Amino acid sequence: MPKQKTHRASAKRFKRTGSGGLKRFRAYTSHRFHGKTKKQRRHLRKASMVHSGDFKRIKAMLTRLK
């Protein structure tokens, strides 16, 4: 049976936390900031955790991620 490979696109977008969770960065942060308020832009800078509904699926793609 072949080795299971890490999904490289996902490996670039998610990081493991110390407690075993997955950290992600927010969308809508590359351009078109003139339509967003200062508060929206400030909150988009912060990372957030992956939701529980997506966690199992993403974890399967990141089999060998430390």
UniProtKB/Swiss-Prot annotation:
Keywords: Ribonucleoprotein, Ribosomal protein. Pfam families: Ribosomal_L35p. GO terms for cellular component: cytosolic large ribosomal subunit. The keyword Ribonucleoprotein applies. One of its GO terms (biological process) is translation. One of its GO terms (molecular function) is structural constituent of ribosome. Belongs to the bacterial ribosomal protein bL35 family. This is Large ribosomal subunit protein bL35.
